[in-house]
């Protein structure tokens, strides 16, 4: 493996770690309604588990409500059950094929719990970044040992890997800071 390929692979892995963090943070509830809250909700449909977005359309008519328009009338009770089982703290109100999910205001205590959870997700992402950095540095050692790169080039590339790690680590920090602001805004 050459050094350019290695850098590209490390960057792709770090991008993936950042995307995972972004997905986890979208699942955290802020005070506003967001269809992203329902991304992980699965529904028993047609004999298998399906994502809610595959059996209904989701919308936010206002800042405190999510509407779930179920396409198949026979699925309404399964969708209600899926939302309840997801344990999001939302109570479905059904009106025909339309399910309204009023978003209750977050208590101060719940906000603090969500901030802690966001920080945990951030720390998990940083651990992933450090593991990726370690793998990259091990690969560089192997390249040096096999006389593919010189010792000084190994040192320079290690510094580049560290810079890349620092860059992505600061992206994680800013994502967490932004989410914390969103959660704590009343």
UniProtKB/Swiss-Prot annotation:
Under the heading Pfam families, the entry gives: RRF (PF01765)
GO molecular function annotations of the record: ribosomal large subunit binding
Per the record, the GO terms for biological process are: cytoplasmic translational termination
Name the domain of life. Bacteria
User: GO CC terms for this protein?
Assistant: cytosol
Keyword check for Protein biosynthesis: yes
InterPro entries, alphabetized: Ribosome_recyc_fac (IPR002661), Ribosome_recyc_fac_dom (IPR023584), RRF_sf (IPR036191)
Keyword annotations of the record: Cytoplasm, Protein biosynthesis
* Intracellular or extracellular location(s): Cytoplasm
Q: Keyword Protein biosynthesis on this protein?
A: yes
Q: Which HAMAP family match?
A: RRF
Per its database record, what is this protein's job?
Responsible for the release of ribosomes from messenger RNA at the termination of protein biosynthesis. May increase the efficiency of translation by recycling ribosomes from one round of translation to another.
Q: Which family does it belong to?
A: Belongs to the RRF family.
Q: What's the protein here called?
A: Ribosome-recycling factor
Q: Please report the organism this UniProt entry assigns to the protein.
A: Rickettsia akari (strain Hartford)
